[in-house]
Amino acid sequence: SQTYDESKWAKAAAAAKDVIELAKTSGLYELYTIAPKIGTLDMYRPPVHPEYSTKDYPDGWANIDPLLSYKSNFDGSVQGSKNPELIFTRTSDGTGTINDWMYQALPRTISGNNRLCVTQKQVNAYAMNDGRTISEAANTGDYVTTGFTTEAYSENNPFLPAKVSLMYNKREPRFYASIAYNGSVWEAASASEPRYRNQQIFYYRGTEDGKQGFKEECPLTGMTLKKFYNSEDSRTDGGYVIEKTEMTIRYAEIL
């Protein structure tokens, strides 16, 4: 029925609470976390907080990598059977579906279909790295919509190489794990030919991956989905694509 019924929300909340209590008593479900590696980038970690920066998870974030802990759920870095965050999943059937989404998002430059886009509204929903909304950050000058980055791409600067709009600076880890924007780098590490690796992609009109004439094989919003992309993924000759797990229900969605 399409009739609004608040009791449905109550039932959903009660069911979610049951799962949370089950997780607490059985240890069956928990958020998937990864310890920070040596040299973990400060750029996508939350700013220093006097109470939480030095405490381990779940009381703080000192012992986790916030970006990889989230990204690994989607990009195939961890097998579904070994991920305590997953409640209901599909692997064999789901992998093909997810990798097809990824193919639709991959830039034409690296042999993708280059057709998937995300909306500005969705991008604006991602917070800053300190948890504030972009509107709140704009009031203090920490979120701007003019200007571009100037530092070259490197292992220490993977998300904001030169010529990227400053509106994408200091965003939360989930943003960098999920969204590709003008100037994002696609690693394609498994590509056999170096020319396909670490490609900085732009979607401006007239560029290889932008709109060309009447052709619309491009992200019309100038942004696409990178959520299910693994840095090793490449559909070029000699490359391979990591298998992913389709997660229908995650514990994070219950909390």
Language model features by range: what are they?
Residues E193-V241:
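Extended glycan-interaction surfaces of carbohydrate-active proteins
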Residues P50-S53, G222, A252:
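A generic alpha-helix propensity feature with a strong bias for hydrophobic helices
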Residues Q2-G206:
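An aromatic- and glycine-enriched ligand-binding surface/loop that stacks and positions planar moieties
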Residues S1, E243-L255:
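Extended amphipathic alpha-helical segments enriched in small hydrophobics
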Residues E85-L86, P173, A177, M223-K227, ...:
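Flexible, active-site-adjacent loop/turn segments at secondary-structure boundaries
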Residues P161-A162, N230, M247:
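Short secondary-structure boundary micro-motifs
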